[in-house]
From Swiss-Prot:
Protein name as annotated: Trehalose transport system permease protein SugB
Similarity-based family: Belongs to the binding-protein-dependent transport system permease family.
CDD domains the record matches: TM_PBP2 (cd06261)
TM regions (residue ranges): 8-28, 70-90, 102-122, 137-157, 182-202, 239-259
Domain (ABC transmembrane type-1) ranges: 66-259
PANTHER family linked to this entry: INNER MEMBRANE ABC TRANSPORTER PERMEASE PROTEIN YCJP, MALTOSE TRANSPORT SYSTEM PERMEASE-RELATED
Length: 274
């Protein structure tokens, strides 16, 4: 019975992984095909070419967009995780007036669909000079990413024994020192998980980046891919779009592979009570 169940789950896992990987493999295949064979319907290219990859880097638009995506994503991640860690610590450890209000406000932010806020954000940023700038994207990204960071980290902070923090305070540490030198190192898996999730959110966003930017000064990689055009009005830039999609997927895959164990530890924190 045990062997049959193991075989069943192995087959099911294989099917799920195959289902998830098939679109990625198809996009990768498209990125290696010349324009003449893009629509041949074959997964394995009959002719392999790297012209699509060379083409997207031929101009400076995609390179600038990649730099913008990396910079905006990293700054958003650092600020959101730092603020989220402090807020999550307060939610998990402290009792203070307005605690429920803070949690409710975080929930309220997640309830709003981003598209309903595009027009107000556009008008506000045009009025104060933040349109088509890094801060013009970083600020709304932080706003939408903070609830995610708070919920991820608060669950992890609740699992850290109180005794460790009390022992640090008995040794003369201030609450701030106990947080920085005891709680934060122990919460490293949760911090890494929150950082990865926030970075993925900022890296993959298209709606806000498309609405709040206009030039290569601030457009991100997803926007650059959406703006790809063929060499003529009769040519579809399918291969270029596929190549760009593969390029912007690589950093996420690398991050997840490097921090896989910490991500799993962070996401499963609080699932089992010891």
């Amino acid at each position: 019975m045990g062997a049959r169940r193991a075989t069943y789950w192995a087959v099911l896992d294989t099917l799920v992984v195959g289902y998830a990987l098939l679109p990625v493999l198809w996009i990768f295949s498209l990125s290696l095909k010349p324009t003449s064979t893009v629509k041949d319907g074959k997964l394995i290219p009959s002719t392999v070419t790297f012209d699509n990859y060379r083409g997207i880097f031929r101009g400076d638009l995609f390179s600038s967009a990649l730099i913008n995506s990396i910079g905006i994503g990293l700054i958003t991640t650092v600020i959101a995780v730092v603020l989220g860690a402090m807020a999550a610590y307060a939610v998990a450890r402290l009792e203070f007036p307005g605690k429920r209000l803070l949690i409710g406000a975080a929930l309220l932010i997640t309830m709003f669909p981003s598209i309903s806020l595009v027009t107000p954000l556009f008008n506000i940023e045009r009025a104060i000079g933040l349109f088509d700038t890094w801060p013009g994207l970083i600020l709304p990204y932080i706003t939408f990413a903070l609830p995610l960071a708070i919920y991820t980290l608060s669950a992890f902070f609740r699992e850290i024994p109180w005794d460790l923090e009390k022992a640090a305070k008995m040794d003369g540490a201030t609450p701030g020192q106990a947080f920085r030198k005891v709680i934060v190192p122990l919460a490293a898996p949760g911090l890494v998980t929150a950082a990865i999730l926030v970075f993925i959110f900022a890296w993959n966003d298209l709606l806000l980046a498309l609405s709040l930017t206009a030039t290569k000064a601030a457009i991100t990689a997803p926007v650059a891919i959406a703006n790809f055009t063929g060499s003529s009005q009769f040519e579809e830039p399918t291969g270029s779009i596929a190549a760009g999609a593969i390029v912007i997927t690589i950093p996420i895959i690398v991050f997840v592979l490097i921090f896989q164990r910490r991500i799993v530890a962070g996401l499963t924190s609080g699932a089992v009570k010891g």
